[in-house]
Regions:
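Conserved active-site tyrosine of GNAT-family acetyltransferases
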Residues: 21, 25, 190, 195
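A conserved beta-strand-loop-helix scaffold within acyl/acetyltransferase catalytic domains
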Residues: 82-143
Length: 212
């Protein structure tokens, strides 16, 4: 429910190359609230793979619905409170993700601590896009580490293993998206893994008040 202290704002997005839209938004009183990058690594031949943190191991995730829901819930938990602007964690969105034709849990890299998911990368290959643009690109769709397992090098370990997984699937480049202001240092992690900024986009906000 809205309260007297709830911040309210109009919001929209624009890619960096849309200069006309940027000028229009500025004239309308919008300000850039956040920067988002798509990052690319163009060579998967040589990947520095660090050791896994002690007590953790990489194991497959089941294709069955309960296993996929366990992974979904772990991902949602990891991003809750850290994901700027919110995200759709609804059951309907989970069901849509399961129905995606490019959904392939065999590409995922999941770190386990016993029966608990400590972190993971949901990798994907967009087959139709690759065919249309004659490329072999894989995506690190989501990268997450749950709070009890952070600051141990797990993020670097699963990102590197994801690059290897995509290479083994026949890809020669990898992409991911990142919030430049991610509070857990995701941008630096990806830069150290060999990613460079490929495209930029802006999140715009313009505050407004509601008459009460």
């Amino acid at each position: 429910a809205l309260t007297a202290t709830t911040p309210l704002a109009y919001g929209t997005w624009s890619p960096e190359e849309r200069a006309a839209k940027r000028h229009l938004l500025e004239r309308a009183g919008y300000e850039v609230a956040r920067y988002f990058f798509e990052m690319r690594r163009t060579n998967l031949d040589e990947v520095d793979v660090p050791p896994m943190p002690e007590g953790l191991e990489i194991r497959p995730i089941g294709h069955d619905l309960p296993s996929q829901k366990q992974l979904w819930d772990a991902d949602v938990e990891a991003f809750r409170g850290d994901h700027w602007g919110g995200f759709d964690a609804s059951d309907a969105n989970f069901e849509r993700s399961m129905a995606d034709p490019d959904h392939d849990p065999d590409l995922y890299v999941i770190a386990w601590d016993g029966d608990e998911i400590a972190g993971g990368v949901t990798n994907s290959i967009w087959k139709a896009d690759n065919a249309a643009f004659n490329r072999r690109r894989g995506w690190l769709e989501t990268v997450f580490v749950r709070r009890p397992w952070r600051r141990r090098g797990l993020g670097a370990a699963i990102v590197a293993r994801s690059l290897v997984r995509l290479r083994e699937a026949g890809m020669d480049e990898a992409m991911l998206g990142v919030d430049s202001g991610n509070p857990n240092g995701a941008l630096g992690l990806y830069e150290r893994a060999g990613f460079v900024v490929h495209t930029r986009s802006y999140a715009w906000r313009r505050p407004f008040e509601v008459s009460r």
